[in-house]
Each structure stands twice: as C-alpha cells, then as structure tokens.
Amino acid sequence: MSDDSSAGDADVDLPEGVERRTFGGRQRLSTRGAQVYGEPVDADGWRAWDAGRSKLGAMLELGMDTGLVGGESVLYLGAASGTTVSHVADFAGPTYAVEFAPRPVRDLVGVAEDRDNLFPLLKDARDPESYAHVVEAGIDCLVMDVATRGQATVAVRNRQFLADDGRLLMAVKARSEDVTAEPDDVFDDVVAELEPAYEILDTARLDRFHADHLGIVARPK
C-alpha cells in the first residue's frame, strides 16, 4: 500500500529532524538524508517518508504519541532493507538495526554507508543475547516491526536493552501470529502478553496504511 494521505494529525509534536513538507502539492512527513527507496527529495534535501511503506511512519501520521524527540539511541528489530530505519537514523542518535535475512542486510549495509550512526546487525531478534555484546545498555527506544509468530515474546526478551524511561514502539502484524484468527483477538492476546513487562501507553489500528496491523506505544515496568 502506498501513501496516498495528506497531512495527519498536525497537532502532535514530531521529533526534531522530522518535518511535514510539501511533495507533489501535499504535505508529507519527511527527514533529511540520502535517498534510499526512490522516495521524492526536495531541493533542501528532505525526503518524503512513505507511511504506506513504514509502520512507524504510519504511527506518526496517525498522531500516536511515540515519545520521540530526536537524538535518541534506538534498537530497531526487523530492519529489512532499511526503508524505515533509514528515516529513523536521519533524526536519531546511535541506531542498531537488527535483520536476520542476509539479502536485505546487504541493502542495509549500503544504506548505512551514508549514515555514520546506523549499525546493521545480521542477527535474529528472537535471540537478543547474540547481539547483547554490541548494543549499548539503556537504549531510549526499541522499535519493532518483526513479522513472525511470537511478536510479544520478542518484545519482552529485548526489554533488557531499554532504559527505565525508554519506549517500545511496536507494529503487530495479526496475520503473522495466526492467519485464521480475528485480528482484534490477536491484538488482545499480544497486549496481554506484553503487560507483565510493559505499561501500555497507546494503541491504534494502522489499517489506513497497513491492513491488520496494530501500533503499540509502551514503556518498561
């Protein structure tokens, strides 16, 4: 699904380094950095952030209060080829990008060549001990876009990296958990599994941009 929206909730504070700018006659989220996936770039070097290709972009467009202010240290799980994490690295501090598939990681390494603060890791997010020696403690933000069964389990296992006042920004894909279940039932189960480890601050369906997805904002208990 591509981003066919105009501006989202303009009253929500965006992180420093994320702006709404005009592309093709409409307002879109943008960050400033090297082009990655053919997105429009304006004369000042700001590139459109396509919420239809980015769960975190969708969360921001829908007005979710992510708690992001800019400059955070970030652990990004499910980085794939770097579409979303490239935007994150444009406005964040040290950004650790975990992806388990070798082919996307090759693309991710190319994205990191233009971003000194982006560190690709060919690792499995289900096994955080495999990268615990690399990722710094007290991370400000854990971003999760992991399309696998057991998404809540992955979030709980990676809680160890978060600062006490850190944030979990998670996109839950219902069909990755159970293709036969109703998405709302899946989302309820995921939230229930998260609650012993996280305080849930906000949830929102992302269907305007991504069918059968739930955005979650939480902080560690």
Regions from the language model: what does each represent?
Residues M1-W46:
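N-terminal auxiliary segments of SAM/dcSAM-dependent transferases
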Residues S2-S5, V12, A155-K221:
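C-terminal substrate-binding/active-site "lid" region of AdoMet-derived donor-dependent transferases
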Residues E16, A51-S73:
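Conserved alpha-helix/loop element of class I SAM-dependent methyltransferases that forms part
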Residues L68-G82, Y96:
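Conserved class I S-adenosyl-L-methionine
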